[in-house]
Amino acid sequence: MARKRSIAKVIYEYSLHYFPVPGRAEASRVALALSKLPWEDVEVSSVGYEIMKNSGDLPWDMLPILKTPFGTIAESSAILRFAGREAGLIPENPYQAAKVDEFIEGMGPLARALDSTFGISDIKKRIQLRKELFEPQGAGTFNLKLLSRKIAQSETGWAAATDEMSIADLKLFTELFGLFSGNYDGIEASVLLDYPPLLEYHSKVSNEPRIHRYYQNFLKDEIRWTFHPDAFEQQKN
């Protein structure tokens, strides 16, 4: 199911609010699209974000948020778990569900890897610091090696070694490969060539029928090109 956007005279019960980039809301967008919830994707500008923050619309002064008939949910992982439950992407087996939570929590350092570079206005310095993240001793390299090892160890090929795709896969797939979309200057897609297990994982998830169908709605030359099945083939040549 394609994500729904608001149109005239249509009121959706659920609305996801985030900046107009994949980022930390993308996994929840996919989960909502795979659920049966009536929802809309609300893109927030930097000015809109300040207005929301100053008006008290953001429980923790951050985006994304999900507005529901019951109230507002903040924090990307909480939103993902809510949407993932509606989409049937949380295992019923308690152990597997716990391993999904474990994997999501374990991804924290990857999600925060670029945080220290966002406030740097000097583009040359920003690019230099981001490149250093993926040098041999960089934090980015450490995280890629760890994730590559975790994927290689999974007997099922899914992120948390679950029987089926879970919200851990949505988070890993969107946040990891979204880093290499070109949206973050200084981070080259060719970095991934050193991690064959991650490229194999990309192929597995991007070709999963529901994921493949979802991203068919997006052009390959826009910011979500890294989520298409053949995204990194050119890097191999």
List where the protein language model places each region.
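Active-site-flanking alpha-helical
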Residues: 84, 175-176, 215
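Glycine-rich, flexible loop segments associated with nucleotide phosphate handling
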Residues: 12, 61-62, 164, 190-196, ...
